[in-house]
């Protein structure tokens, strides 16, 4: 700092309130005078009834001042209350000033607090009916511009504080050409109350805010930008209502006419004082008139009407300009791509690092609150009102027109805290995961510290898996299908076949189910047998509706199909359950289309029986056999003599509890990912095993025996006629009786009689009432000479 401004001992004073600007500028000795401190003190002694008001001589040339405050409380505090209040007052205002100085001036927070709390002077009013004083912080210097900029901060402190002294700070003194009554002088000649000095400060310079005497203990700060630079080039923002409408609202508030109304425009309305024609009392405070004019300011998206001079002498009025503010808030939230509309008409919300449905709980409202602090200050305060939040939420819903396709990342596994790439093992979180729009997840957080191969849990898990599906040459094909099926549960795409887990009781099917449920969490759903045995239509079907976007569906405990009255598995249902879209809606909902990403596993102790068998069905069925029995010690001997089991193991009574406590969650998940990369990269492959279904034996074999007749077989008719074939309607046909004779050479009628009859009924045709035929040719009849 320049040495010229480190000191000022010439005190410029006004001799009365309301000195005309011209007299002040010309330094008319009738109204103004300049003193050295000792001269000022003698002048007051010689003129005890004088009225002196300290002010800066020329703010443009020199505006260094001490931080000062004027406190005026219309109540008298007793000594104890006063001491407590003044102590809290010093702490509050020093903290407030230090925060402002740090934020706006780049000052050192601790240094400001230290300089303010270590050295200050207090005056005391001789008026016994009130508590009034001036406080001068002797070693804390700033500029008048800085004090003016600090006015709002101190005003907010004054309004929010519970301290009566803090609430009584007069912020009106922070203005251009401000004045402060000199200690020991009167406010006017008729007023006999004055402010007196208090120990330990007995020098008049300690009570003057324009006196400057900087030393090593002093601290100075000022605005990093001038007030003029802080004013934006254009005050009126596009989101506001029109300026004309806003000024009309201001005019209606005053009731009395504004004489210079037509002089106001978008660029000057904050600097031009309002000239009011007080025909009637002030509409704000009901006083007959005001000496100082009202003025307008623009704050937080609203016009603020306040009175210059002492602002507490009239009410402050706010005129909101938020014609489209709530709409703008909704638009800003939409711009973050944190709320989307799915193709099913659902709203999904990006919150806490994952996409979630806005269904059971109001997640859009939670999102609005969570990003409130990321919005500009003028918007964030609006969201504290529940009614306005609801309006913003409604705006967001109305503005979302274009739907987005979700869950199109089959090789990504979503968690509560991010997304796991199944191919390369990368885990994406935060904004990196946001681009993978997945509406369902495992429901738990991914923990990379547990997602490792070498762990005690992995060792225990491998022993469990190897017991359920042994790694033997005889079981190699079965084990491979077991691994393929379970790892396909990670994939978010439609699977081409259903898998039956077939085996006697206590062979590890339910253990596998619980391990899978633990590993993929909410992506697993268990359903009933009705999805296999009942007609699937567009009616209410919560079992089908719950399959939407799930990656594994487990259907347990099929009935014993040998029992009378039990329903067979519907072939049509199997076909529908391998389609990308499954029809079925929840109760009280019209959403009937469910995206089918599930690996459907059917846990059964009985061989499956179908109502109808064809090639389409056989291409959609795979079977994993379970032949290791887990037995109690008492039943082990009987189990070892049962041909249904290859091995018998002792049952681990504590295993179920460990699985329920998710001990093997990340170990099994690691294993599933490993199998996924082994079998399903780059293409997911899940093949049927129709040869494992006894009921398919006839259809698998007959497909190797017969071909449909066609025109290319007509030239062979000479040889075929000798073998019982006839030509009917230009098609080679085989009479029914002849077909039955030929087919009996390949199939035992006692074992396959029902299948033969079913095949005939499905394919036979009628020449007339009594003659029946089939349009099939035995392969051996056209291949043999």
Swiss-Prot record:
A Pfam family of this chain: D5_N
Organismal lineage: Viruses, Varidnaviria, Bamfordvirae, Nucleocytoviricota, Pokkesviricetes
Annotated organism of origin: Vaccinia virus (strain Western Reserve) (VACV)
Catalytic residues as annotated in Swiss-Prot or TrEMBL: 170
Segments of this protein annotated with the region Primase: 342-469
A single GO BP: DNA replication, synthesis of primer
Protein purpose: Multifunctional protein required for genome uncoating and replication. Major viral uncoating protein that is required for the release of the viral genome from incoming viral cores containing the viral DNA genome. Possesses an ATPase activity that is required for hexamerization and uncoating.
Gene giving rise to this polypeptide: OPG117
Main location per the UniProt record: host cell
Keywords, alphabetical: ATP-binding, Helicase, Host cytoplasm, Hydrolase, Nucleotide-binding
Binding site for ATP: 503-510
Residue ranges of domain SF3 helicase in the record: 477-639
Gene Ontology cellular-component terms listed: host cell cytoplasm
Protein name: Uncoating factor OPG117
Family indicated by similarity: Belongs to the orthopoxvirus OPG117 family.
């Amino acid at each position: 700092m320049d040495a010229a401004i480190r000191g000022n001992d010439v005190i410029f004073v006004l001799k009365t309130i309301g000195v005309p600007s011209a007299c002040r500028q010309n330094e008319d000795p009738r109204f103004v005078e300049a003193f050295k401190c000792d001269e000022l003190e003698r002048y007051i002694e010689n003129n005890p009834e004088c009225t002196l008001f300290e002010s800066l001589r020329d703010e443009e040339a020199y505006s260094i001042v001490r931080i000062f405050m004027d406190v005026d409380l219309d109540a008298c505090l007793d000594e104890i209350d006063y001491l407590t209040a003044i102590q809290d007052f010093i702490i509050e205002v020093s903290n407030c000033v230090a925060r402002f100085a740090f934020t706006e001036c780049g000052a050192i927070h601790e240094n400001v607090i230290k300089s303010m709390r270590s050295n200050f002077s207090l005056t005391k009013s001789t008026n016994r009916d009130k508590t009034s004083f001036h406080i001068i912080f002797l070693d804390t210097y700033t500029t008048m511009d800085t004090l003016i900029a600090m006015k709002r901060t101190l005003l907010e402190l004054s309004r929010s504080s519970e301290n009566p002294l803090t609430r009584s700070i007069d912020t009106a003194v922070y203005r251009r050409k401000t004045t402060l009554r000199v200690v020991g002088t009167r406010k006017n000649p008729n007023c006999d109350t004055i402010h007196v000095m208090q120990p330990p400060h007995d020098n008049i310079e300690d009570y003057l805010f324009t006196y400057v005497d900087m030393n090593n203990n002093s601290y100075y700060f000022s605005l990093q930008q001038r007030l003029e630079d802080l004013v934006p080039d254009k005050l009126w923002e596009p989101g506001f209502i029109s300026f004309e409408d806003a000024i009309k609202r201001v005019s209606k508030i005053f009731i009395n006419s504004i004489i210079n109304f037509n002089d106001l425009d978008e660029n000057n309305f904050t600097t031009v004082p309002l000239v009011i024609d007080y025909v009637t009392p002030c509409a704000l405070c009901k006083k007959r008139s005001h000496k100082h004019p009202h003025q307008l300011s623009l704050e937080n998206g609203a016009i603020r009407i306040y009175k210059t001079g002492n602002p507490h002498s009239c009410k402050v009025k706010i005129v909101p300009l938020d014609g489209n503010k709530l709409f703008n808030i909704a638009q800003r939230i939409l711009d973050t791509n944190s709320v989307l509309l799915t193709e099913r008409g659902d709203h999904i919300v990006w919150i806490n690092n994952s996409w979630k449905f806005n269904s059971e709980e109001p997640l859009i409202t939670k999102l609005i609150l969570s990003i409130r602090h990321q919005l500009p200050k003028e918007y964030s305060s609006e969201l504290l009102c529940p009614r306005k939040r609801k309006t913003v939420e409604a705006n967001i819903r109305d503005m979302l027109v274009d739907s987005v396709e979700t869950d199109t990342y089959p090789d990504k596994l979503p968690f509560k805290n991010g997304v796991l790439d199944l191919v390369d093992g990368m885990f994406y979180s935060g904004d990196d995961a946001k681009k993978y729009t997945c509406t369902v997840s495992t429901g738990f957080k991914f923990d990379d510290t547990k997602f490792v191969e070498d762990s005690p849990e992995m060792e225990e898990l491998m022993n469990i898996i190897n017991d359920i599906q042994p790694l033997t040459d005889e079981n190699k094909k079965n084990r491979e299908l077991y691994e393929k099926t379970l790892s396909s549960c990670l994939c978010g795409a439609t699977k081409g076949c259903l898998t039956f887990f077939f085996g006697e009781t206590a062979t590890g099917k339910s253990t596998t189910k619980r391990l899978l449920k633990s590993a993929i969490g909410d992506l697993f759903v268990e359903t009933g047998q009705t999805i296999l045995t009942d007609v699937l239509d567009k009616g209410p079907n919560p079992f089908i509706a719950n399959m939407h976007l799930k990656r594994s569906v487990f259907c347990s405990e099929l009935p014993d199909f040998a029992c009378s009255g039990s329903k067979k598995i519907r072939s049509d249902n199997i076909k529908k359950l391998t389609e990308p879209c499954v029809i079925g809606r929840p109760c009280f909902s019209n959403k009937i289309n469910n995206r089918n990403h599930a690996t459907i596993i059917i846990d059964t102790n009985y061989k499956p029986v179908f109502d109808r068998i064809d090639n389409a069905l056989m291409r959609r069925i795979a079977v994993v056999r379970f032949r290791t029995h887990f037995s109690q010690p008492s039943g082990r001997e009987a189990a070892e003599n049962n041909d249904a089991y290859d091995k018998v193991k002792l049952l681990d009574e504590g295993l179920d509890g460990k699985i329920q406590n998710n001990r093997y969650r990340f170990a099994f998940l690691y294993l599933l990912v490993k199998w996924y990369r082994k079998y399903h990269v780059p293409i997911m492959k899940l093949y049927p095993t129709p040869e494992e279904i006894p009921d398919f034996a006839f259809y698998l074999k007959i497909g190797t025996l017969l071909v449909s007749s066609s025109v290319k077989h007509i030239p062979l008719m000479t040889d075929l006629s000798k073998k019982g074939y006839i030509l009917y309607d230009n098609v080679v046909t085989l009479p029914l009786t002849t077909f039955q004779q030929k087919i009996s050479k390949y199939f035992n009628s006692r074992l396959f009689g029902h299948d033969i009859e079913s095949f005939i009924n499905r394919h036979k045709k009628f020449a007339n009432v009594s003659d029946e035929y089939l349009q099939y040719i035995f392969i051996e009849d056209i291949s043999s000479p």
